[in-house]
Regions:
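Active-site mouth of glycoside hydrolases
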Residues: 1-87, 91-94, 123-127
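Intrinsically disordered, low-complexity acidic/polar segments
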Residues: 49, 97, 141-142
């Protein structure tokens, strides 16, 4: 995975956006011959983007990436906020298997689960491979470290409870005919 360290990039600032465009182009040129890279992901969790600057930057980055390396798919934004993408990736930290299963259902004519539902300037799902590229987040650490830690769904009481919750999440993905991949974080 060729992914940028772009988390919290303020895409609304012209200088930041133009700097990112130049830096990302250099990354793609540098790494395009690495056989272990299967896709490009220039953005991660670009929650603050507005309809003008964000859409323009994502389209520019997508098109430049494709021009430099037309052999690989481009996932415009990990965690949704898609503008133009070859892979539809979302983040889903739901801890309850039944709720997660319900969220993953794709009904004819309806949008699948997505992180950003309220932004009408974003792309509409068009059947791209659908991945949950961040899930899990189950808190599990030594007793002495728990005070300053966090996670989703509360601390499991023991290792068996941890694995049961994790198994429920994974089973929800495996049982979904639409999920083509997932990544624990």
């Amino acid at each position: 995975w060729g992914e940028s360290a772009s988390w919290m990039l303020d895409v609304n600032k012209e200088l930041a956006a133009r700097n990112f465009l130049g830096e990302w182009s250099e990354v793609v040129v540098r790494d395009r011959n690495h056989p272990s890279l299967v896709t490009w992901t220039p953005f991660n969790e670009t929650w603050g983007g507005g309809p003008d600057a964000y859409v323009r930057l994502v389209r520019d980055v997508y098109n430049i990436t494709k021009a430099i390396d037309p052999t690989r798919p481009v996932n415009d934004a990990s965690g949704d906020n898609h503008v133009i993408t070859d892979i539809w990736r979302v983040h889903n930290y739901e801890q309850d298997r039944a709720k997660l299963t319900e969220q993953l259902k794709m009904e004819e004519g309806k949008e699948p689960y997505r992180n950003a539902r309220d932004k009408d300037f974003l792309a509409v799902y068009e059947g791209q491979p659908y991945m949950v590229d961040e899930f899990g987040g189950i808190p599990w650490m030594a007793e002495k470290d728990r005070k300053n830690s966090w996670g989703y769904g509360g601390m499991p009481e023991n290792a068996e409870a941890f694995y049961k919750r994790l198994e429920g999440q994974i089973d929800a993905f495996i049982d979904s005919p639409h999920v083509t991949g997932f990544c624990y974080t």
